[in-house]
C-alpha cells in the first residue's frame, strides 16, 4: 500500500504534464493568427533527416526574406545560392481544406504547417516533401532578427527530435552566406 501511493502520485504528475503539453499544442492551433506572421524574417536553422537536402548546394537550402499573408495563401520571398550567386525566388503556399496546413510545389510537392511561433521573435515550420515516390521532412526556424537566443534554438532542437530528426542534422544558418546583401 505504501508503494501504491507514490506510484499514483507519479502517474497523476505525468498525466498533468501530458495534458499541459497537449493544451499548449492545441492552443497554438486554436489561437493562431496567421496575419501576425506577415513581414520580414531571417533563416536561422534548417533540419532534415536527409541532411544533403539542406547542406550547401542542397535543393532545399533557402533563405527566407519575407512572408506575405493573403486571403488563402502565404507568399514566401526567399533567396537561393545558384552558381555562387544569390537568386531571388517567390513561392506561394496555398491553404488546404485543413486549417493551418498549406501546400506548394517546389522541388516536389510540399505540405507545411507552422508548429510554433510567438510572432515577434521566431517561427518554427514543419514541411513534408514528396518527389519521385520519396518523402522526407524538413524543419525550419525563422527569426525576426538575424539570430535568436540559445533558448529558442534549444526549443527548435527538441521539436526536431520529436519529429525524428537528430541534432546532428540541424544546420545553424547564422554563420553562412544567407544572401543578406540581396535583401531590399
UniProtKB/Swiss-Prot annotation:
Molecular function, one GO term: small molecule binding
Taxonomy, superkingdom: Eukaryota
Compartments where found: Secreted
Family classification: Belongs to the calycin superfamily. Lipocalin family.
Primary role: Binds pheromones that are released from drying urine of males. These pheromones affect the sexual behavior of females.
PANTHER family per the UniProt record, alphabetical: LIPOCALIN, MAJOR URINARY PROTEIN 1-RELATED
Principal localisation: secreted
GO biological process: aerobic respiration; cellular response to lipid; energy reserve metabolic process; glucose homeostasis; heat generation; locomotor rhythm; mitochondrion organization; negative regulation of DNA-templated transcription
SUPFAM superfamilies: Lipocalins
GO cellular component: cytosol; extracellular space; nucleus
Tissue expression remark: Abundant in the urine of adult male mice but absent from that of females.
Signal peptide bounds: 1-22
Residues that carry a glycan: 66
UniProt keyword list: Disulfide bond, Glycoprotein, Pheromone-binding, Secreted, Signal, Transport
PTM (free text): Glycosylated.
Protein name in UniProt: Major urinary protein 3
Disulfide bonds: 86-179
